[in-house]
Amino acid sequence: MAVHVENLSDLAKTNDGVAVSLNRYTDWKCRSGVSEAPLIPASMMSKITDYAKTTAKGNSVALNYTHVVLSLAPTIGVAIPGHVTVELINPNVEGPFQVMSGQTLSWSPGAGKPCLMIFSVHHQLNSDHEPFRVRITNTGIPTKKSYARCHAYWGFDVGTRHRYYKSEPARLIELEVGYQRTLLSSIKAVEAYVQFTFDTSRMEKNPQLCTKSNVNIIPPKAETGSIRGIAPPLSVVPNQGRESKVLKQKGGTGSKTTKLPSLEPSSGSSSGLSMSRRSHRNVLNSSIPIKRNQDGNWLGDHLSDKGRVTDPNPERL
């Protein structure tokens, strides 16, 4: 089983022949012309060389590359012509064979969509070889400034045993996250987003790729706010609640129409229009207390003493 080393200074101390798994992350800006960056910096290569010197005699140390993930986000306007070509380069080979077979992708920053490029390398190099490089070539983008931001994440292991893998063609996935915005600006975001690649390919069964337990975590979904709408009239809410209770007791489906209560005794001359006007007037005057007098009419406080006897002893009149 591979041993994961967090601190690069501890790499040379692991000299018992056990493979050491490493995960690397970096980011850079893509400018006009050709942008080329090594996957392993020179400072780390010196650590690997020291590790190779401390191993048992007769065993050659190998760099077993596993996967390379690039996240590209545009920094130019929409509908700008041109495209970029991303290639995985092996600088230890001369001529056109430097470009690894099947590890070339094309992307248009002017489309306004960030992209995710997954290179399934499964290749190995000796410790004294130059590391792989990522080459991004600008073709037809009319700008002198940077046109994209690249975030790279890759994994490899250092060990005394050589393993042979079969490389898979590179894949490009467009991200629907908005223009000039990418969710892969940190190593944790990259690990979370590429989890489906481990589920849909044989990369999941490779122990060298599963050095961390949080690799196969599904990205959390964005929380949406509560849905707001127009509330029903206050006079309807209590009746709906009572009717729903009655329907539940009777086993109804709740499809009956809720009728508004009549605000005054119905007569033959009253119409639905007059009732709606009266209900609208009562809603507007809801701030005035309403009570019923002796005649059964709706009156306010300013009219409650008119048209009736207020003296408790009517015999005096």
Swiss-Prot record:
Localization: Host cell wall; Host endoplasmic reticulum membrane
Q: Is this entry keyworded RNA-binding? A: no
Coiled coil ranges: none
Q: Which UniProt keywords apply?
A: Host endoplasmic reticulum, Host membrane, Host-virus interaction, Inhibition of host innate immune response by virus, Membrane, Suppressor of RNA silencing, Transport, Viral immunoevasion, Viral movement protein
Biological process according to GO? symbiont-mediated suppression of host innate immune response; transport of virus in host, cell to cell
Against InterPro entries, the record matches this protein to: MPV
Q: Which Pfam families match?
A: 3A (PF00803)
Q: Which spans does this entry mark as compositional bias, Basic and acidic residues?
A: 302-317
Give a GO cellular-component term.
Answer: host cell endoplasmic reticulum membrane
Question: Spans of biased composition, class Low complexity?
Answer: 255-276
Q: What is its main location?
A: host cell
Copy the domain comment: The C-terminal domain is essential for localization to cortical punctate structures at an early stage of infection.
Q: How does it assemble?
A: Interacts with host glyceraldehyde 3-phosphate dehydrogenase-A/NbGAPDH-A; this interaction plays a positive role in cell-to-cell movement of the virus.
The task this protein performs is described as: Plays an essential role in cell-to-cell movement and long-distance transport of the viral genome. Mechanistically, movement protein is recruited by viral replicase complexes formed on RNA1 to punctate structures on the host cortical endoplasmic reticulum. In turn, interacts with the viral genome and mediates virion movement from cell to cell. Also acts as a suppressor of RNA-mediated gene silencing, also known as post-transcriptional gene silencing (PTGS), a mechanism of plant viral defense that limits the accumulation of viral RNAs.
Q: What protein name is recorded for this chain?
A: Movement protein
Q: Which organism is it from?
A: Red clover necrotic mosaic virus
